[in-house]
Swiss-Prot record:
Transmembrane portions of the chain: none
A Gene Ontology cellular-component term: extracellular region
The protein's name: Conotoxin Mr105
Record family assignment: Belongs to the F superfamily.
Molecular function per GO: toxin activity
Post-translational modification: Contains 4 disulfide bonds.
Keyword tags: Disulfide bond, Secreted, Signal, Toxin
Organism from which the protein derives: Conus marmoreus
Tissue specificity of this protein: Expressed by the venom duct.
Subcellular location: Secreted
Length: 93
């Protein structure tokens, strides 16, 4: 079930990637806010699925994402997390 949720999140991320990379980034915009919150939830779910001990992104409030750089850092780490998840599942018997 977790695998399906993570894969669904990957699909959603790929579909919404152009929106995430847009030049205008205002965390008060409802669409941007939704992307940040959903990305944060997906990162948290991926951390749980990979049995990570600590997920620093989950503890950040919305104000911490006012800088686009912070959001892009989280997305970059999410890609590594999802790759680790998929590699681990491929190696499982």
């Amino acid at each position: 079930m977790q695998r399906g949720a993570v894969l669904l999140g990957v699909v959603a991320l790929l579909v919404l990637w152009p929106q995430a990379g847009a030049e205008l980034y205002d965390v008060n915009d409802p669409d941007v806010r939704a992307m940040v919150i959903d990305g944060q939830k997906l990162m948290h779910d991926c951390a749980i699925a990979n049995d990570y001990i600590d997920d620093p992104w989950w503890t950040l409030n919305l104000g911490a994402f006012e800088e686009k750089r912070v959001y892009h850092s989280m997305l970059s780490e999410l890609v590594f997390c999802l790759n680790a998840f998929l590699q681990r599942r491929q190696q499982a018997p």
